[in-house]
Amino acid sequence: MKRILLLLLFGLGVFSAQSQITVDNTLTVQQLVDDVLVLGQCAEVNNVASPMNSDFAGLGFDSFGAFDGTTSTPVFPFDGGIILATNGIDMVPTGMPNQNGGNPPWLGDADLDALISEPNGTNNATIIEFEFIPFVDQISFNYLLASDEYPTFVCTFADTFAFILSGPGISDV
């Protein structure tokens, strides 16, 4: 049973400066999925891609990578994982100095636009998608959505995250 997983994250602004996570932008999208997200031998993973991120806009920074939260004080809720952002991930550990981390903006995502009722649509999409066949009966993913824009842009922008599963035997939810 093949399932397509589409990860989208919009508006991952910053974590508190106290979190002091570290970020790594050196891993490929394939390495992020194989070595960070799908650990061990629990699934067969194919067709890993990032069809939209800051690289497509030629902005000179990375909007995805890995993070390590094991040395953070206070303790960060996750030891590590994948980070998807609407700005450069290098801004995440200490916070964005201004609200222009995603400037100039790059394209949004049509799938997410169809799911939300945002009149202006989406922008600054960072997407990782892949197909996987689980070798277990149950799967789970932990995630955290953070935004430094919320207090400033309430009712102006919708910081949005979507975890979309599709494929045989999966009904639209």
Q: Where do the model's predicted regions map?
A:
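Aromatic (Trp/Tyr/Phe) and Gly/Pro-enriched flexible surface segments
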Residues: 20-173
